[in-house]
Design a protein with these regions (language model features):
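Conserved phosphate- and dinucleotide-binding cores of soluble alpha/beta proteins
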Residues: 83-159
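N-terminal active-site beta-alpha-beta segment that forms phosphate/nucleotide-binding
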Residues: 2-93
Length: 159
């Protein structure tokens, strides 16, 4: 099986698991993830944070956005309609990036949603920022078929 076939198979398996998650369980698990992030020293110190708009079955991050608003942090939202790095204009340093994905490893490897946007964004725009993957526990796998351009995350937070 080719690397691309492996990625597509894993992506399909994870999508099925994400879609099978009961909405109430998704909310509860999302809250656990957010609570773990809120306890991180790097989160508490971050002043400029890139967030993502979760797709329907991904972890919900509204409590994190609320915390940033309460603290007066600058929030940069990456929307699903942004298909290229040129769709996002950021002028200045970024402290932290919350990163969505389909699958992750414990050592920071990530398989994205399949569009390549976050990979390009992380490679070109947020090199010095702390990169945190946001995932449900079942999205953690032993290994991923990676490409040379894939950017490792500093941390992956789960429920």
């Amino acid at each position: 099986m080719s690397k691309e076939d492996s990625k597509q198979t894993l992506r399909a398996q994870m999508q099925e698991e994400l879609q099978g998650l009961d909405p109430e369980e998704r909310r509860g698990r999302s809250l656990q993830i957010c609570n773990h992030v809120l306890e991180l020293p790097v989160w508490k110190q971050a002043r400029v944070v890139v967030v993502f708009e979760p797709f329907k079955h991904e972890p919900e991050i509204t409590p994190l956005i609320s915390d940033l608003q309460r603290r007066g942090s600058e929030i940069i939202a990456i929307l699903p309609t942004a298909r290229s790095q040129h769709d996002v204009a950021i002028f200045g340093p970024i402290d932290l990036v919350l990163v969505p994905g389909i699958a992750f490893t414990r050592n920071g490897a990530r398989m994205g949603r399949g569009f390549g946007f976050f990979d390009r964004f992380l490679a070109h725009r947020a090199i010095a920022a702390i990169k945190i993957g946001i995932a449900f526990r079942f999205q953690i796998v032993e290994s991923l078929p990676l490409e040379s351009h894939d950017v490792k995350l500093d941390l992956v937070v789960t429920d």
